Amino acid sequence: TVLQHLVAAKLCLIMPENSFEIHGASVADGPTDRNGDFVINNTIIHCTTMPGALLIEKCKTNLRNGTHPVIITIFDRVHTALNLAEDAGLAGRVEVWDVQQFLSANVYEHSLFDESKRNSTLSDIISRYNNIVLDTETDPSLRIEFDAK
């Protein structure tokens, strides 16, 4: 849940408004006719802390449909996702990104690598994240408190 909404908050910074849909983390892809957590042009983004066989099957379907799957996961699971993709014959066809690098690269880019602007950029991402939580989830305790200094 947190992972998916942090990714959504980051995407909101760089994508035009309403260019992709944001769903509650408990909303399954199947019933909503989605190919992944985020569909942006021909890229399908999957957010998970536990990559598994079902996710790799979704990636296969993405590729068959002419779209490009990207898995965003936690650092400890990057190699798991890469190994699963390789075992399924998808090596080099599925991107796998560590969420911390995905987010921190954005913070550095949007702050123009100026340390004095980093907290402001991070605060913007967290504010967007908190709004997403309030709009899509029933548990407000998922919000993040951040005091930009």
Predicted regions, residues:
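Catalytic core segments in nucleotide and nucleic-acid processing enzymes
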Residues: V2-K149
